[in-house]
Amino acid sequence: MFRATCNTRDFKKVINATSNLVDEICFEVDENGIKASAMDPSHVALVSMEMPKDVFEEYEGDIQDIGIDLEALKKIIARGRGDEKLILDLDVEKNKLNITFKSNVTRKFSIALYDVSSSNLKVPDIEYPNSVSIKAGAFVEALKDAELVNDHITLKIDENKFVIYSKGDLNQSETVFDNSIDDDDNALADFNMGEASRSTFNLAYLKDLTKSTAAEDLLKIYLGSDMPVKIEYEVSGSKLVFLLAPRIES
């Protein structure tokens, strides 16, 4: 069986963040909570989410895989209000996931499930030379600046600085977060440099990765030369991890 009750607002954030990259996902349910990982259709990005049982008000889950149409789930969750309780209930016989919004009014939906098994996708255990923790709002603003110039972006670590750089045929954009200078906004919360590095990425993917973040969310970004960038952040106890392959420049 599977039945869980949680805050609609928090669950919506997790689903929105995940569905920005993938349309289908397999919820791996057990007594400890929900885990899921999926690749985007182009196999450029991997998304992983983990919702431990502690983030739910009530939780019961046996070991099983639940194939979810994320686009359908996202549309239904969008109808929920932040003050409503959200109840997820698996109907094994009908192969459906029942979704209930509960306040002084009760609204019920159900979605058909895919017949899938666990993909066994895991976030690879990569040792990164560098990492930064940065407020999502500051990172997103730098992406918006870069978008004016090109559809690719370079992330650099060098000389105690985190640099977000984009160059077109005629124009360029550069945002520098200097760890040696005190920042009143505390945009750069943590900086760990092992070696100078630079990697280039598809800007559209990075925008999708961060589309559902709040300005004050803290992004943990792991970097190395020509390595996938790993971005982690939390939503009210749930953990989201994104991995994006670099663009190898000739």
Curated annotation (Swiss-Prot):
Record GO biological process? leading strand elongation; regulation of DNA replication
| Gene3D superfamilies recorded | 3.70.10.10
- Give the keywords, sorted: DNA replication, DNA-binding
* UniProt cross-references to CDD domains, sorted A to Z: PCNA
Which Pfam families does this chain map to?
Answer: PCNA_C, PCNA_N
Recorded GO MF terms: DNA binding; DNA polymerase processivity factor activity
Tagged with keyword DNA-binding = yes
InterPro entries, from UniProt? DNA_clamp_sf, Pr_cel_nuc_antig, Pr_cel_nuc_antig_C, Pr_cel_nuc_antig_CS, Pr_cel_nuc_antig_N
> Which family, according to the similarity comment?
Belongs to the PCNA family.
Q: What role is this protein assigned? A: Sliding clamp subunit that acts as a moving platform for DNA processing. Responsible for tethering the catalytic subunit of DNA polymerase and other proteins to DNA during high-speed replication.
Question: How does this chain assemble?
Answer: Homotrimer. The subunits circularize to form a toroid; DNA passes through its center. Replication factor C (RFC) is required to load the toroid on the DNA.
Q: What is this protein called?
A: DNA polymerase sliding clamp
Gene, per the UniProt record: pcn
